[in-house]
């Protein structure tokens, strides 16, 4: 009986310590990690679609870059979130799923235009999110992650601005 009580107490202490660990992550940092994970899932999913549906070679190549780069970003944010005890979503947000569906309905050069427009606006928001974390985040590790991936978002924004010009999506 005492052994069972001791085991139950230990399990409860472990559960509470992991809960306290997750709750000790400031709201801004937690939101940034969750938003970054959703964004990475979105980019990977949309990039895979662009790899197959892209009309131009440039749109398909941009899709490949998104899958490659945002897969690395996803692994980094997952590792950081795990170390901080933050539970991340396993896919894009509901709004992002809607954007994927709407963009995917286009075909040919219309797909390329819709994809370029979507990604230009998305990467502008990614840069703003990274800037916000760098400015407002409390924990050093999420701030460093934001700083690291801000450069990638800027490169991606340049890719999609060029694609938008090529496919007359401006």
Where are the regions a protein language model picked out?
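His/Met- and acidic-residue-enriched segments that coordinate or traffic transition-metal cofactors
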Residues: 2-8, 17-170
């Amino acid at each position: 009986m005492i052994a069972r009580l001791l085991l139950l107490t230990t399990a409860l202490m472990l559960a509470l310590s992991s809960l306290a660990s997750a709750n000790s992550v400031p709201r801004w940092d937690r939101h940034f990690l969750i938003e970054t994970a959703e964004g990475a899932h979105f980019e990977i999913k949309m990039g895979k679609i662009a790899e197959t549906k892209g009309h131009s070679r440039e749109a398909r190549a941009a899709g490949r870059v998104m899958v490659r780069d945002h897969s690395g970003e996803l692994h980094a944010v997952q590792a950081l979130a795990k170390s901080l005890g933050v539970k991340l979503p396993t896919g894009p947000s509901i709004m992002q799923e809607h954007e994927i569906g709407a963009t995917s309905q286009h075909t040919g050069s219309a797909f390329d235009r819709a994809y370029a427009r979507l990604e230009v606006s998305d990467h502008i928001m990614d840069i703003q999110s990274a800037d916000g974390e760098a400015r407002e985040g409390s924990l050093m590790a999420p701030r460093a992650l934001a700083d690291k991936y801000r450069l990638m978002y800027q490169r991606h924004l340049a890719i999609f601005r060029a694609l938008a010009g090529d496919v007359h999506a401006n």
